[in-house]
Amino acid sequence: MSMILFASIVRVRDGLPLSASTDFYYAQEFLECRRQLKTLAQRLARHPGRGCAESCDFLIYFSSSGDVACMAICSRQCPAAMAFCFLEALWWDFIASYDTTCVGLASRPYAFLEFDSVIQKTKWHFNHMSSSQMKSGLEKIQEELEFQPPAVLSLEDTDVANGMLNGHTPVHSEPAPNLRMKPVTALGVLSLVLNIMCAALNLIRGVHLAEHSLQVAQEEVGNILAFFIPSVACIVQCYLYLFYSPARTLKVLLMLASICLGNAYLHGLRNTWQILFHVGVAFLSSYQILTRQLQERQSDYGV
């Protein structure tokens, strides 16, 4: 019998199932385990990182990072390192196929059911490959588990099966792993320098105008905000380029719109070339942010 029986991808914040393996077992114990997995999925926001729970004759493993979690039902003969190795491989494959915006906007269960083909392929590999073929990946996961043990949940003690948590069972959660971005490019460095320069220019002009307006009139408040808001947006663009953030596309569009609208509002205080320069830098930075992706995971799991 296979050691990994079922796998599911869920959204952490609300437990919405995004995809799952379509093979099915009709044993009563397995059906009960499936029901408990669905209930547990709704509580993953309280248990970040890795964890497991016993259910009938099976074990439920889960591993979450960001707003995506992978869950699996395994036989008791399945080593924990192998289960978490499988879940991590599945997680990398999923985020490589769907960005955080798609995940966040999903409104119906199993919106990415076509990912089942990847789940089936990955599950087959782990069920049929020997430990020696996955040695490097298993050793890495085993070291992580020894350093930071996964949360061990008791479905009965925590009343997860009834949709409640009584809060008496201690849970040792693991922080989500750091997501590494691809290396910074020369054009990316240029966009950072130009962004910082634009932020400084906006800040200086805004402060100067604020000091002048406080002494003369109050009708310049709109112009002051039109300097300060793009200044903050430029700094946020620098952050989005350097560090991974969920819903990057939405944030990039918001920052770009703030800079464009702010400069359009300042048409009377800036000439056309100055406005084009600031807007051009904003578009360059937005492009650099959206094209700098997460690093490819190393293929050390034999998948």
Curated annotation (Swiss-Prot):
Residues spanning the membrane: 184-204, 224-244, 249-269, 271-291
UniProt membrane topology term: Multi-pass membrane protein
SMART domains xrefs: Longin (SM01270)
Record topology, Cytoplasmic segments: 1-183, 245-248, 292-303
GO cellular component, one term: endoplasmic reticulum membrane
Protein keywords: Endoplasmic reticulum, ER-Golgi transport, Membrane, Protein transport, Transmembrane, Transmembrane helix, Transport
Principal localisation: endoplasmic reticulum
UniProt entry tagged with the keyword NAD: no
Any Pfam family matching the protein: Longin
PROSITE patterns in alphabetical order: LONGIN
Lumenal topological segments: 205-223, 270
Sequence similarity: Belongs to the synaptobrevin family.
Task of the protein: May be involved in vesicle transport between the ER and the Golgi complex.
Protein name: Vesicle-trafficking protein SEC22c
Lineage: Eukaryota, Metazoa, Chordata, Craniata, Vertebrata
